Amino acid sequence: MLQACKMEGFPLVPPPSEDLVPYDTDLYQRQTHEYYPYLSSDGESHSDHYWDFHPHHVHSEFESFAENHFTELQSVQPPQLQQLYRHMELEQMHVLDTPMAPTHASLGHQVSYLPRMCLLYPSLSPAQPSSDEEEGERQSPPLEVSDGEADGLEPGPGLLHGETGSKKKIRLYQFLLDLLRSGDMKDSIWWVDKDKGTFQFSSKHKEALAHRWGIQKGNRKKMTYQKMARALRNYGKTGEVKKVKKKLTYQFSGEVLGRGALVVRRHPPH
């Protein structure tokens, strides 16, 4: 039989050994009752620990009420409590939202004043010129003639200081001196005393000469004799030209005459 089991492939379980300790069920039951007396099925020995409940016993105070007056607690709905909790939550939300209203109002009040603050800044427009002469000089191109520039440079051969397109910076007194020595526009300006440097403008053609000076300067606005005479009076402070008592008459200084004579000797007219 043993060989047959080995051949069929089943494991062979040896018989129990004699060294094993036999299981004593009585000992286990006895220890359980000693250490855990309440696990015992003997209910009579512990009858004094129980409380007898009689389901038909009713307190004397409730004997006068009918049975239909008593209801189970599970069927009772607390709608009043739910409404109370909801009312408390709404009050809390109202308390939290109330302080925010003045904040939004104050912000809108501040923003509304921003455009008015911008209007307080003064405009950055340029100052008005003191005269039309100065305005014309400021608007003229940088290479064009201006009466406020330094002493004019000597012109090249064949070119006069007063010619248009020469691109030589020239002052007004030099422009007039070149016209007098060249004889150009003799109907508008002429010598009263060449040796003394006294000259006079024509009352009829003075505006034509002023217009040519405006073209020489490159002014956008029309040059007038009044503006040109204002520039000549300013030369009285520096000494190049002074006003003579005679009407429309002026006089060059000796320095300007000597400088002009030197220019003529270097570049004689062709």
From Swiss-Prot:
Gene Ontology molecular-function annotations: DNA-binding transcription factor activity, RNA polymerase II-specific; RNA binding; sequence-specific DNA binding
Ranges annotated as spanning the membrane: none
Pfam families: Ets (PF00178)
Biological process annotations from GO: cell differentiation; positive regulation of B cell differentiation; regulation of transcription by RNA polymerase II; transcription initiation-coupled chromatin remodeling
Keywords tagged on the record: Activator, Developmental protein, DNA-binding, Nucleus, Phosphoprotein, RNA-binding, Transcription, Transcription regulation
Region called Disordered, residue ranges: 124-162
Subcellular location: Nucleus
Top-level lineage group: Eukaryota
Positions of modified residues (Phosphoserine): 140, 146
Keyword hit for Cytoplasm: no
Gene Ontology CC terms, in alphabetical order: nucleus
Means of activity regulation: Transcriptional activity at macrophage-specific genes is inhibited by interaction with GFI1, which results in the inhibition of SPI1-induced macrophage differentiation of myeloid progenitor cells, but not that of the granulocyte lineage.
Low complexity composition-biased segments: 153-162
Region forming the signal peptide: none
Residues binding DNA: 217, 230, 233, 243
Residue ranges of the annotated DNA-binding region, renumbered to this chain: 170-253
InterPro entries (UniProt xref): Ets_dom, ETS_fam, WH-like_DNA-bd_sf, WH_DNA-bd_sf
Subunit structure: Binds DNA as a monomer. Can form homomers. Directly interacts with CEBPD/NF-IL6-beta; this interaction does not affect DNA-binding properties of each partner. Interacts with NONO/p54(nrb). Interacts with RUNX1/AML1. Interacts with GFI1; the interaction represses SPI1 transcriptional activity, hence blocks SPI1-induced macrophage differentiation of myeloid progenitor cells. Interacts with CEBPE. Interacts with IRF4/Pip and IRF8. Interacts with JUN. Interacts with RB1. Interacts with TBP.
Family of the protein in this entry: Belongs to the ETS family.
Protein purpose: Pioneer transcription factor, which controls hematopoietic cell fate by decompacting stem cell heterochromatin and allowing other transcription factors to enter otherwise inaccessible genomic sites. Once in open chromatin, can directly control gene expression by binding genetic regulatory elements and can also more broadly influence transcription by recruiting transcription factors, such as interferon regulatory factors (IRFs), to otherwise inaccessible genomic regions. Transcriptionally activates genes important for myeloid and lymphoid lineages, such as CSF1R.
UniProt name for this protein: Transcription factor PU.1
